[in-house]
Swiss-Prot record:
Residues 622-690 form the S1 motif domain. NCBIfam families: polynuc_phos, PRK11824.1. This is Polyribonucleotide nucleotidyltransferase. It is an enzyme of class 2 (transferase). The gene is pnp. It comes from Thioalkalivibrio sulfidiphilus (strain HL-EbGR7). The keyword Disulfide bond does not apply. It comes from the Bacteria. It is found in: Cytoplasm. HAMAP family: PNPase.
Length: 693
């Protein structure tokens, strides 16, 4: 049982791959250590294939164990539960660059599991997990056309930083993860503070250049410890079947792909597919199966759509490569919400709603590195009706979580700080129609809904999805892709940003050989499209509303001395509870004495403020107060002049005339005006009624 180790320097960290000792029954297993963040990644491929399967069943599961950070999970069961948002997003991040590297026709089940076992809070486990997945697959003998490398790139003080620490990322203008093979970039996921297209492309190329060190070491590890390659052979292409399908329907299918309206087009394509299957898959000996006929029909669809674009002919819906679909924008579409927008681009439509909340509405996130509170949430819903289908409705799927995070990345750079916007914000994007690029419609709708809610965004933002069709050296970059173009194309390239720069870039490439020239063209064309969309949005709403909705909470903020916090809270929280119940407000007090009062009704907020000021006010010597007599004694009367502050009016200070008995002049409950004569060192207050007059 000999462990084989390989190490290399990767930015400021040393990365070590170890195999041969742990998880030896997996097809491939690697323990990756990057500066004490340790991830065990396994890959298992099954040799048997289910009969009739026509897809590649790859699953990737990334899971974080709380013991990795020396913590015990919360909750009743004290064990990890369903995947967190971070785990779901990282699973997608690993899946996206490895999926296109399995050969066409490979239908064997493959599962990759990455388990975080030790966590250095300065090193995010996502890059080690991606490197581990690449190494495990390279060792497994599976027909994987890798390995891939992965790198995180930051941008600090005008310079790129390889694999920055979590502390450095807080000050970085860029957080970009790039993955690719030795020759080509396959995947980019990034968030930026409105950087130029040149800086973004430079970061992608820098990351690809630096990841070669990881690819080299993975190749060395596979050469030394890899399992024998599977004797899998790609199924032979059935040229006769392809020709038969083309002869049966090519002209009709070409005509169908000129129907601009999605549902009418789909009906025609489905009818043609059924007719061809019925004609060719007869069930007779030697006749092809229905699955094989459908596969050949799908290949014909792809060829027709792609060749039209490469020849410069109109796209499916009649557009050229640069034109964006017609856009309509409406704001304030839902009367009782705090901010709303309806964004429609062709057959893609989103109703986006913004809600303004208080500090107590912030999301408590129990991450592996500890708890934190999230003040801005963006949720994306993709119901089945948006594509004219039926289906399950319930908790969000991986895709919905991924699209929601991408839309959030798109607007994060223009979000105001807490000082400019004291609200906790939740945005929900309801996709009501979908024909490509619904995540970018969510970016546009979010920008509009937040401005409609009166949130002071630094600038409006918009997003656009680009596509690519490439055959040999010929290629065409297409703007604002349809769902069919996404499915049949070679690249999905989403860019969000303001007029001044890029806020998010997501790229998934299905083929080798995407050059810098192609990416430059795609970014330039995306900018052109983004500026066009912003122009349409700005024509309806170009800056935030000056007033928040009448139904949104209004904030009143005041500062009290930290020593006075206990006076506002009261014994067991009784005072603050009474305050919130009696005024109908929500009150949050920070340790530094900042008090935030939230109320939908302005008068209620003013009343709560007045009462807090009374509770925390200092008694001023020489000032006249109106107070209530609370206790009569032989020697005088106690009067409450401020909440919780009583003073004594001595019998000699009640009147200029001689007073025989206090009760002759005062009774409990009387309202009287008194002047403060003295506050002694023990805080006792001496009052006078006769000094008032």
């Amino acid at each position: 049982m000999t462990a084989i180790k390989k190490s290399f320097q990767y930015g400021q960290h040393t990365v070590t791959f170890e195999t041969g000792e742990i998880a030896r029954q997996a097809s491939g297993a690697v323990l990756v250590n990057m500066a004490d963040t340790v991830v065990l990644v396994t890959a298992v491929g099954l040799k048997d294939v289910a009969q009739g399967r026509d897809f590649f069943p790859l699953t990737v599961n990334y899971q974080e164990r709380t013991y990795a950070a020396g913590r015990i999970p919360g909750g009743f069961f004290k064990r990890e539960g369903r995947p967190t948002e971070k785990e779901t997003l990282t699973s997608r991040l690993i899946d996206r660059p490895i999926r296109p590297l399995f050969p066409k026709g490979f239908m064997n089940e493959v599962q990759v599991i990455a388990t975080v076992m030790s966590m250095n809070p300065e090193v995010d486990p996502d890059v080690p997990a991606m490197l581990g997945a690449s190494a495990a697959l390279a060792l497994s003998g599976l027909p994987f056309k890798g390995p891939i490398g992965a790198a995180r790139v930051g941008y600090l003080n005008g310079a790129y930083v390889l694999n920055p620490s979590m502390s450095e990322l807080k000050h970085s203008d860029l957080d970009l993860v790039v993955a690719g093979t030795e020759k080509a970039v396959l995947m980019v996921e990034s968030e930026a503070k409105l950087l130029s297209e040149e800086v973004m492309l430079g970061a992608v190329m820098y990351g690809h250049e630096q990841m070669q060190a990881a690819i080299k070491v993975i190749n060395e590890l596979a050469a030394e410890a890899g399992k024998p390659a599977w004797d899998w052979v790609a199924p032979e292409e059935n040229v006769a079947l392809k020709e038969a399908v083309a002869a049966a329907c090519e002209a009709e299918l070409t005509a169908a792909y000129q129907i601009a309206e999605k549902q009418a087009r789909n009906q025609q394509v489905n009818a043609l597919r059924d007719a061809v299957v019925a004609k060719l898959a007869t069930g007779e000996e030697g006749a092809p199966s229905a699955e094989k006929v459908k596969g050949a029909f799908g290949a014909l669809e792809k060829r027709i759509v792609r060749s039209r674009v490469l020849k410069g002919e109109p796209r499916i819906d009649g557009r050229d490569t640069r034109t964006v679909r017609p856009i309509t924008v409406k704001t304030g579409v839902l009367p009782r919400t705090h901010g709303s927008a309806l964004f429609t681009r062709g057959e893609t439509q989103a109703i986006v709603v913004a809600t303004l909340g208080t500090d107590r509405d912030a999301q408590l996130i129990e991450a592996i590195e500890g708890e934190r509170r999230e003040r801005f949430m963006l949720h994306y819903n993709f119901p089945p009706f948006c594509t004219g289908e039926t289906g399950m409705v319930g908790s969000p799927k991986r895709r919905e979580i991924g699209h929601g995070r991408l839309a959030k990345r798109g607007v994060q750079a223009v979000m105001p700080g807490e000082a400019e916007c004291p609200y906790v914000l939740r945005v929900v994007s309801e996709i009501t129609e979908s024909n490509g690029s619904s995540s970018m419609a969510s970016v546009c709708g979010t920008s509009l809904a937040l401005m409609d809610a009166g949130v002071p965004l630094k600038a409006p933002v918009a997003g656009i999805a680009m596509g690519l069709i490439k055959e040999g050296d010929a290629f065409a970059v297409i703007s604002d892709i349809l769902g069919d173009e996404d499915h049949l194309g070679d690249m999905d390239f989403k860019v969000a940003g303001s007029k001044d720069g890029v806020s998010a870039l997501q790229m998934d490439i299905k083929i080798d050989g995407i050059t810098r020239e192609i990416m430059e063209k795609a970014l330039a064309q995306a900018k052109e499209g983004r500026l066009h969309i912003l122009e349409k949005m700005n024509a309806v709403l170009s800056e935030p509303r000056t007033e928040v909705s009448a139904y949104a909470p209004r904030f009143t903020t005041l500062k009290i001395h930290p020593d006075k916090i206990r006076d506002v809270i009261g014994k067991g929280g009784a005072t603050i509870r009474a305050l919130t119940e009696e005024t109908g407000t929500s009150i949050d007090i920070s340790d530094d004495g900042t008090v935030k009062i939230a109320s939908v009704d302005k008068a209620a907020g003013d009343e709560a403020r007045r009462r807090i000021e009374e509770l925390t006010a200092d008694v001023e010597v020489g000032r006249i107060y109106e107070g209530r007599v609370v206790k009569i004694m032989d020697f005088g009367a106690f009067v409450t002049i401020l909440p919780g502050r009583d003073g004594l009016v001595h019998i000699s200070q009640i009147s200029e005339e001689r007073v025989e008995s206090v009760s002759d002049r005062l009774t409990e409950g009387d309202l009287v005006k008194v002047k403060v004569l003295e506050v002694d060192k023990q805080g006792r207050i001496r009052l006078s009624m006769k000094e008032v007059g």
